[in-house]
């Protein structure tokens, strides 16, 4: 930290106080956003923090002027938070910011217009990020992380403020998305349901009136929830909406959407192009796609094992594991095509021994009972049309469309 004289510290603090009060007086939301964006680590805020750590009695400056003292509670907590943030005391920074945020929300509630909505977004974002950092600090010191959960409670309070009628309600979706990020981080995604119900069933909300950015984020998170619920058609609809409306320059965001949309599409029998996987660095799906195309169960299992940690973290491992049935279907189709070339008259009759032999070639050693069980499941799931002749150990395939395409429908439960 560069040396700051007492006089310079006084000047910097007074300048911030004037800029804050001007922003409120002239309803200048963009300036207010910059004044509250701690995580941006902007030079003006860092220099203010240095000044606050030199001039310790900033509260006296606030009290000296009626103009400043009108927002005294807000400003005092902002200063305390920024001081602590600058010296790396993230827990104290969070606690002070939480008090500031509550005071700011109360002030926002009293303002008739929605001029400060963007500034409120900054407050919601900053408290979530600061809570995550504070919890990381607490965990590293062997203490219980609890700040993000508390931040979630504040965000719910903000949602309640915005969920009424009037121009402020357009901000409800942004706060909802911050709540989603909080709940996903905490592993309490079940708490998302009440907020979703408010957005999707309340008559005061028209989804199309929300900003595009927020709609994309909302569809991304609700799409992920549908993946966890294994409601793949709904997940496809929501994630596809997010992809189609995402800013094409935001490649990182597109990749985040595709991390979930690709396994959803695969579950619906839709295989992405190799070019898509290359363009967005989704190499973890390359071998899975190859396994589906080839009917290679060994390759699928190898790909799942190779990227197991990544798939588990994303929550798509079980979704991808269930693709085994589609791989079996592709393998049966290959056996059928080969038999059709060598013995057209009996192409629709697949011997279980022949299937077992093909599986052994893929290092999948199964006895006939296991093969029969797999074929029974494929028939039950409508991935194969036909029936099992148990005594003769033969699968008799339908002569009409023996391997139905999913055509965007999930494998039946």
From Swiss-Prot:
One of its GO terms (biological process) is ethylene-activated signaling pathway. Residues 216-402 form the PCI domain. Keywords: Nucleus. Pfam families: PCI. Disruption phenotype: No visible phenotype, when grown in absence of ethylene. Extreme ethylene responsivness, when treated with saturating ethylene concentrations. Curly leaf. It comes from the Eukaryota. PANTHER family: PCI DOMAIN-CONTAINING PROTEIN 2, UNCHARACTERIZED PROTEASOME COMPONENT REGION PCI-CONTAINING. This is Enhanced ethylene response protein 5. The lineage of its organism: Eukaryota, Viridiplantae, Streptophyta, Embryophyta, Tracheophyta.
